[in-house]
Amino acid sequence: MLKISILTPIYGVEKYIEQCARSLFEQSYAPIEYIFVDDCTPDKSIGILQSLLKEYPERAQQVRIIHHEKNRGVGAARQTALMAATGDYLLFADSDDMLPKDAVEKLAEKADSSHADLIDGSYREWCDGKADMLQKPFDVADGKLLKLLVCQNIITNRLWGRIYKRSLIMEHRIFFEEGINYAEDLFWNAQFMFYGKKVNIDDAVYYYRTDNENSYNHNISEKNLLSYFKSTRRLIDFFEQNDTEHQYLRATEIGIVNAYRWAANAHVAFEKVDQALAYKPKSCLIRLIIKLIKKGVPVKRVNLIYLAYRRLYTLLISAPSAVS
């Protein structure tokens, strides 16, 4: 049977860690390795986790809790867990979320039968103790999926609700970067999808909590935006080095516009975006769109051009003779 490593960073989740950990320990699948990374959490999260382990003696021997000497952020915590993992596949579980009891079993069964690099499952959003409607993964070819991801704001760049083949991660050194704590999943997933092959399952394998106001997704601060800009720059670097046929150039430049849209909406100086990205788009239209945003044209008006162009691109890549 395949061994699955579940990787969970812990910081400031004493309200949620018990519910999360119980869902992990009560999985129907046996060969699981649990790696929790304590990123110097200031609350009682680790104590709650350690007390809970007494109720699951059969799982306790499968658990490792790694402590950071100082708070280093979620990017570093994910990387610490990744490097400690020994499983055939990795499953990222955030410490305020939950898994259905048969989630790992269903993902592992599909991995075993398909030998795919990425097994992508369905999920439900969780709010106020209730699960929302089922969200299924995009059922499109791998190359198109990556282009949609890189365009940004079309499909999610989530790490959770999936399992990733560890050997492919190590072979291509697909690592997280300390200091990128928001949108760290964007450039990480793009790299994995560039090399890997994906299959889907329709079963719900993850409950994604939307009512935790302390999560990164609820705090779009300037600090988080700067992290997102850095993630986008890493994306540019990766494709400049590896996309020799420029298959993802247009998608990358469409995604770059998103950084300026976010900056405008958050009133972040455009100079900070320019400095972080350090990139001049090849497309004249993309340069024009960015210029309009920087000149103060309302984003809603610029979107009339930008979203139409993005929509046209997504239609073209779906055509039989797809464009780059």
Where are these regions (language model features)?
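Nucleotide-sugar donor-binding/catalytic module of glycosyltransferases
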Residues: 1-230
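Residue-level detector of alpha-helical secondary structure
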Residues: 50-53, 108, 236, 240, ...
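Helix-centric, low-specificity signal for extended rod-like, repetitive segments
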Residues: 71, 155, 254, 284-287, ...
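A compositionally biased, intrinsically disordered/low-complexity signal enriched
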Residues: 97, 102, 245, 251-252
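Generic detector of well-ordered alpha-helical segments enriched in charged/polar residues
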Residues: 146-151, 236, 253, 274, ...
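Alpha-helical scaffolds flanking conserved acidic
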Residues: 185-186, 250-254
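Catalytic core of nucleotide-sugar-dependent glycosyltransferases
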Residues: 197, 204-212, 218-250, 258-283
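Membrane-interface aromatic/basic loop that binds lipid-linked glycans or pyrophosphate carriers
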Residues: 267-324
